[in-house]
């Protein structure tokens, strides 16, 4: 028997807020489910506007598509634990995914998790090195590196290591950083001060552990 699962709680991240909302909403609506969407606290406006447009179209009955905003502990956790929510779909960190799985056990609701990872990009000596360098750089820097599948762990065979390092360094050094709304910018700011401090911490950690910076590494933390 195939039938709608019921009320679906959908919790989405901040790195692709509009796209993630569209992905989550479309399949649940197509399956005949009602939805409570919880966007990330850093990026709620795109989800609010999208659902406003959909609800104003009068294509859905009132109450089918709903949005709650707020921090995880205030909005996400109650949604995951609510006894009248039949399924939770979450995209985000592994740590939060574990908490959602635990919270969902109260009524044995269905759970689907799309969690982040850091599987490495590996370049072998028989690869098309120019293409591999371009692809690896794109995997590292796409969306400012704010991607759950970002290729920021890169391993290259010793025979091509220096060539790969030089190529990635050259690409990184030539990226134009600027305001996100400036069409000439190739990379805008990170999503929040919290994320900036986290990334800066990774740089400092690498330096303290003997890592060599081959491009960039300087940043302004005055504001």
Task: Report the location of each language-model feature.
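Rossmann-like NAD(P) dinucleotide-binding subdomain of oxidoreductase/dehydrogenase enzymes
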Residues: 1-131
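ALDH superfamily catalytic-core signature
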Residues: 63, 95-223
């Amino acid at each position: 028997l195939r039938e709608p699962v019921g009320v679906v709680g959908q919790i989405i991240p901040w790195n692709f807020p509009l796209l993630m909302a569209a992905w989550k909403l479309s399949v649940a609506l197509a399956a005949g489910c009602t939805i409570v969407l919880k966007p990330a606290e850093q990026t709620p406006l795109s989800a609010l506007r999208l659902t406003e447009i959909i609800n104003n179209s009068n294509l859905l009955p009132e109450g089918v598509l709903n949005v709650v905003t707020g921090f995880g502990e205030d909005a996400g956790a109650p949604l995951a634990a609510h006894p009248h929510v039949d399924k939770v779909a979450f995209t985000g960190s592994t740590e939060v995914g574990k908490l959602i799985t635990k919270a969902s056990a109260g009524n044995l609701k269905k759970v689907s998790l799309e969690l982040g990872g850091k599987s490495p990009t590996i370049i072998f000596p028989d690869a098309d090195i120019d293409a591999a360098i371009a692809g690896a750089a794109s995997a590292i820097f796409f969306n400012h590196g704010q991607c759950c599948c970002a290729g920021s762990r890169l391993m290259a065979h010793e025979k091509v290591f220096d060539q790969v390092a030089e190529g990635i360094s050259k690409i990184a050094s030539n990226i134009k950083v600027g305001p996100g709304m400036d069409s000439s910018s190739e990379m805008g700011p990170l999503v929040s001060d919290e994320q900036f401090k986290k990334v800066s911490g990774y740089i400092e950690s690498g330096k303290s552990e003997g890592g060599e910076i081959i491009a960039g590494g300087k940043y302004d933390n005055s504001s």
